[in-house]
Amino acid sequence: GNFAITEGAILAGCRFFAGYPITPATELAESMSLRLPQVGGVYLQAEDECAAMHLCIGAALGGYKAMTATSGPGFILYADPYGWALGCETPLVVLNSGRVGPVSGITGAPGQGEFYLMRYPTQGGNFETICLAANSAQECMAMTVEAFYLSERFRMPVSVLADQLITDGFEDISVPENEDEMKEMGFRVWPREVCRGPDFYPATDELDIPPVVLGHNTGALCSDWTPTEEGYDIEEVEAHHKHAYRLIYKVRNNKHLFNHLYEKKYMDDDPDLVVVSYGTPSRVVNTAVAKARQQGLKVGALRLINVWPFPDEHFTRRTKYLVVELNWDGELVREVQRAAPKDSEVHFLGSCGDLPTLPALIETFEKVIKDEPLTRKGWELEEW
């Protein structure tokens, strides 16, 4: 997965990477250090994660397509520069390869404990975020390309969320060799010649403007304070209203620009139970759903890929939902409970550092459909 992300970044035009080694994203930095010089790019190892993302912001302001990568303990250190990039509308791509927590946890075990951190990566509020979740090496490559596209289209940092099993795993991938093959595979890339224009635009949620304005040899005037339309600091509430409105609604009002071909529904014909997941658990879930249907259970699956902004539109059906996550505290399940119709049942099955087994999943499907209480490993799981 790490090497697939590297190839996806290079396909998208990435020519700058800064990072700090952390398992399970270290191999991505290693492969970037090898591949970027081969294509005329720049690799820098920073003194910490905070510095790494600031370096990427500086590179992006200078016209580079830039990227950084880390795991949960390092993503926390992105809080300051992530907010800076959001407020200054600076396009770059961030990979987070999740490992089990809290804190350092186990470096070689997968986790999904940063679901909400991807939505709220910095302080202050008044912004929207975009996050894509992959479940294979092939998707790691494809979604990295897509993340660069979205970052320039929306002028903001975009995150790719994976986990240890995906980024450390090895699978065959199909790499396009030219632009025609990229288009055939559904990849979208903004060519550099369209990324020109004035430094700043009026506060609006419209996107009929050049998607990014960087690298046109005039410098970029940026401020992490509330800016005027020319980029200077100002302390006026009306100006802040315009600025915050744009940061939120340029995303919310233009979700149709996301590549919804990536959304995956599986055996979704009027099921009694819809199993919701993302990342590595979705691979086990799909297999379990197929086996359960062979046994006569009406079960369907929904795998989320565009996880932020959260796709409320997928949860209009009044039915039973089971959310499967790589954590015990429950994060995705809270959003499903919020988005699902109020008379729907939403259940939770979590695991901590290990994947649920097929027998455990099928047993859980049966219990939810029959309204029996859920148990696992002796622990009573809370009903949401």
How should these model regions be labeled?
Residues 1-121, 128, 164, 362-365, ...:
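Thiamine diphosphate
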Residues 1-2, 152-384:
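Flexible, low-complexity linker and terminal segments
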Residues 89, 97, 103-175:
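Core active-site phosphate/anionic-ligand binding loop and the adjoining beta-turn-alpha structural block
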Residues 31, 55, 80-81, 146, ...:
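A short acidic, amphipathic alpha-helical/loop segment
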Residues 10-13, 33-39, 95-97, 122-128, ...:
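Gly-rich Lys/Arg/Thr-decorated short loops/hinges at beta-loop-alpha junctions or inter-strand turns
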